[in-house]
């Protein structure tokens, strides 16, 4: 089988066939570029001769046959070949055990799941994956979130997905670590420009240029892109502007480089919508807008130096500055059981005094007023009960995060007796400063689902309203954190075919919160200082009895310290609506994950790659955001134990010169292992419904064995690539996933009754196909077509149970159901879904000049 310069078509790695799919993707990409180049490697496994970085910093370079885990890799050619608009799209289509939840319904804001652990841009999502760029941790200090839009896809040279709780990757590596390496002018010389356009107002342009000097070792690389789309859903435009640059100097003994990344992005993701409304209009939205503005600066000074034939040093020093502003228009669920239509005499007088006219003197009701507003306006003027009479709420947040740090490690090749050693010892220091402010303003829902705000004494949710249910949504929090780490790894060659790895890392973290609104540490104050420390070990072994098969097994531990947002929102007596409110809190514990995995991988006759593996990850004191009611309020708590275990299988074959195909299958069992009682107002099995008061606030009981929502049990990925000539390439890939319970249905017992509760409480299984075509009319030029969701399948990858405040005609309605025996008005509850994108096509033109 022909080989590519980077990776042979045959690799013994354990990446699921999705990885294999990428391997082929890379192979076809290379072949498509020139008449005679060998096929590139796919996202599958690494070749036997290829080495991978087994730690964030360079230096721990191990042949893949010595890595005791199902590591997956991919290159920039793999991503280009699949026409993936961003990193997360590529991973979801091409890498084994990876799925996404499009909770925000924006392509650049997904939750990325790997083996049931998540890296998400959304506060409140349990984070369990660490992400690194050139050795710098990208999980942000505030909530460990990952903003996928902040780094340009085209700057990525390669990625490595490391499974398990590998302690070498530090905090938050509970289920895995994603390590990204960027391009440079030595390995990526030349110039490229690309333009694209497609449906839903999609337009984009990107460029890259790089080079190096043979005389003095200087090298440089720059890439940038601009992208806009109107979005396929109502009022959902997004704009991305990204720039990455690197300059460095290579000497005979090493390299020094300085890289910079800038991002200026405006994202709109209008989230979930009630199931019935989606059936009527798949592009409809519940309320608008849901805007996120990210501005980011990233600087990284990195070096690698060979100190001798056996000893080397690598290190970096970095600085990040991220500004995030959000502006969200939401339904105020507190109004759904209130009388919000006809203003009373005092309210009419206040309206008249303020100069309003046209308000009804009598008779306003749900039947004749689809979008009520007058009682809301009057209660804002009176500062009386806008929290109950206004059906809209505008939430705004401002987050500023500065984090900086440095790391260094020594790598030594040594021999003791007959045993060879690959030793790595390192240290790291990371610090951050965070400021977070928030406010909420009352308003009313317009027919277009936007929120109109009103000026007046009661305009803001500051707790001053004359209402027993008044709440204060203001937050003014500052936080500082410091983490110091020491780590060590030793890979021992017990025999030429057997390698044992021992590793460990010690982390010490301090988090200090300062509350500007309620200082002093008393009741309701966010002030506090929290310290967490832990040593996490790892052990693994590989045995390669022949070049065609490798056995591996291992066990490791990772941990995660609670962040400022979790430490400030942990009191069940004062739930938060993330990111709307914080409260004084009881202490939280670190999350500790222990992972066991074993498997084998191999190749047959240079034409077949395969892998099979099993894994189990047990979380102790898992940090979960527990919903308190249907409107999104809740709190963080340590949740006893959870477990993710599963099977991974992959296959990649090349049956003929022009054909490559394969796939991977992931079977995941993600469950709660501890009994717990949590809020479950949207769930038909809640305690209130059991007591004869459906549609009102209640709790649900989670039992050991109940499945964690939004993590499909079965995921199958298949691909086939056809390259009839050097000028043409056609690729087809498919992702199929089983249905899952939605959030709020943690006990799996929600069932519709058609009146108080609607929707199934689950997502349905689905299969989505994607088609790509490349044509190279002449050297350097490429025209491409990409169609996603080829058969226009309606599907959802995310959902939750929540209040349904709209009729089948799209009108807002309060007190939609008659009062119960207790005099309380039930609120209809439904299943809300974040709809998947419909069939979308775009075309592009790329020109590449590699120079001499």
Model-derived features with residue positions:
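Transmembrane beta-barrel wall of Gram-negative outer-membrane proteins
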Residues: 192, 197-228, 232-270, 289-312, ...
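A beta-strand signature from Gram-negative outer-membrane beta-barrel systems
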Residues: 94, 138-140, 149-194
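Structural signature of Gram-negative outer-membrane beta-barrels, strongest in the C-terminal barrel
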Residues: 401, 413, 420-432, 475-618, ...
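Face-selective signature of the C-terminal outer-membrane beta-barrel domain
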Residues: 255, 296-327, 331-516, 611-614, ...
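Periplasmic plug
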Residues: 104, 110-163
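C-terminal beta-signal and adjacent terminal beta-strands/loops
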Residues: 2, 559, 736-748, 774-852
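Gram-negative outer-membrane beta-barrel transporters
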Residues: 407, 411-412, 495-496, 500, ...
């Amino acid at each position: 089988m022909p080989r590519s310069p980077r990776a042979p078509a045959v690799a013994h790695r354990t990446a699921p066939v999705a990885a294999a799919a990428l391997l082929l993707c890379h192979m076809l990409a290379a072949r498509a570029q020139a008449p005679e180049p060998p096929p590139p490697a796919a996202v599958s496994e690494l070749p036997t001769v290829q080495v991978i970085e087994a730690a964030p910093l360079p230096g721990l370079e191990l042949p893949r046959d010595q890595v005791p885990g199902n590591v997956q890799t991919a290159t920039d050619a793999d991503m280009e070949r699949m026409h993936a608009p961003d990193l997360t799209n590529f991973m979801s289509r091409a890498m084994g055990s990876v799925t996404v939840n499009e909770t925000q319904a924006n392509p650049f804001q997904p939750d990325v799941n790997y083996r049931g652990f998540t890296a998400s841009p959304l506060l409140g999502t349990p984070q369990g994956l660490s992400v690194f760029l050139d050795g710098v941790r990208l999980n942000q200090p505030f909530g460990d979130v990952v903003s996928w839009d902040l780094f340009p896809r085209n700057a990525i040279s390669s990625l490595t997905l490391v499974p398990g709780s590998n302690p070498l990757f530090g905090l938050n590596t509970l289920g895995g670590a994603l390590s990204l390496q960027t391009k440079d002018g030595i390995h990526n010389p030349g110039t490229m420009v690309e333009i694209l356009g497609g449906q839903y107002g999609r337009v984009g342009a990107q460029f890259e240029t790089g080079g190096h000097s043979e005389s003095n070792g200087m090298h440089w690389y720059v890439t940038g892109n601009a992208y806009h789309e109107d979005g396929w859903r109502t009022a959902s435009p997004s704009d991305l502007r990204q720039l990455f640059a690197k300059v460095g100097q290579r000497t005979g003994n090493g390299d020094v480089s300085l890289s910079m990344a800038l991002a200026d992005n405006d994202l709109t993701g209008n989230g979930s919508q009630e199931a019935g409304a989606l059936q009527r209009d798949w592009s409809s939205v519940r309320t608008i807008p849901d805007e996120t503005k990210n501005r980011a600066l990233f600087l990284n000074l990195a070096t690698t130096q060979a100190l001798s034939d056996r000893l080397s040093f690598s290190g970096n020093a970095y600085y990040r500055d991220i500004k995030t502003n959000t502006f969200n228009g939401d339904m105020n669920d507190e109004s759904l059981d209130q009388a919000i239509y006809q203003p009373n005499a005092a309210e009419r007088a206040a309206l008249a005094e303020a100069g309003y006219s046209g308000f009804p003197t009598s008779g306003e009701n749900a039947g004749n007023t689809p979008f009520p507003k007058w009682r809301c306006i009057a209660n804002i003027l009176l500062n009386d009960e806008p929290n109950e009479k206004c059906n809209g709420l505008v939430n705004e947040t401002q987050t500023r995060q500065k984090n900086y740090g440095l790391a260094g490690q020594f790598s030594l090749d040594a021999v003791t007796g007959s045993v060879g050693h690959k030793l790595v010892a390192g240290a790291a220091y990371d610090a951050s400063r965070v400021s977070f402010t928030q406010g909420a303003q009352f308003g009313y829902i317009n027919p277009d689902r936007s929120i109109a705000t009103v000026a007046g004494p009661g305009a803001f949710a500051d707790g001053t309203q004359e209402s027993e249910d008044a709440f204060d949504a203001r937050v003014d929090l500052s936080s500082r954190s410091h983490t110091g780490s020491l780590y060590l790894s030793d890979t021992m060659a017990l025999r030429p075919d057997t390698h044992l790895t021992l590793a460990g890392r010690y982390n010490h973290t301090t988090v200090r919160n300062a509350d500007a609104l309620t200082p002093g540490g008393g009741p309701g104050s966010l002030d506090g200082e929290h310290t967490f420390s832990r040593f996490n070990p790892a052990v693994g072994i590989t045995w390669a009895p022949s070049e065609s098969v490798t056995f591996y097994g291992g066990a490791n531990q990772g941990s995660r310290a609670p962040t400022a947002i979790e430490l400030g929102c942990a009191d069940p007596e004062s739930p938060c609506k993330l990111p709307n409110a914080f409260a004084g809190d009881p202490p939280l514990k670190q999350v500790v994950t222990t992972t066991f995995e074993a498997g084998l991988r191999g190749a047959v006759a240079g034409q077949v790659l395969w892998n099979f593996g099993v894994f189990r990850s047990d979380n102790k004191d898992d940090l979960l955001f527990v919903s308190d009611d249907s409107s999104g309020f809740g709190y963080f708590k340590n949740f006893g134990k959870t477990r993710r275990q599963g099977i991974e299988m992959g296959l990649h074959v090349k049956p003929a010169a022009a054909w490559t195909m394969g796939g991977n299958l992931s079977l995941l069992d993600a469950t709660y292992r501890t009994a717990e009682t949590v809020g479950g107002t949207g769930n038909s099995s809640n305690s209130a419904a059991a007591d004869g008061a459906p549609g009102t606030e209640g709790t649900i009981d989670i039992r050991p064995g109940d499945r964690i929502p939004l993590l499909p049990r079965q995921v199958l990925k298949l691909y086939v690539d056809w390259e009839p000539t050097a000028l043409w390439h056609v690729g087809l890939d498919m992702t199929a996933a089983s249905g899952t319970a939605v959030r709020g249905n943690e006990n799996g017992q929600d069932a519709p009754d058609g009146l108080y509760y609607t929707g199934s409480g689950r997502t349905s299984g689905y299969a989505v196909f994607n088609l790509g075509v490349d044509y190279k009319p002449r050297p350097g030029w490429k025209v491409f077509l990409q169609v996603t969701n080829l058969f226009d399948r309606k599907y959802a990858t995310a959902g939750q149970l929540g209040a349904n405040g709209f009729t089948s005609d799209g009108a807002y309605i309060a007190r939609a159901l008659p009062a119960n025996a207790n005099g309380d008005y039930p609120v209809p509850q439904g299943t809300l879904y974040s709809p998947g994108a419909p069939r979308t096509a775009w075309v592009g033109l790329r020109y590449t000049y590699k120079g001499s």
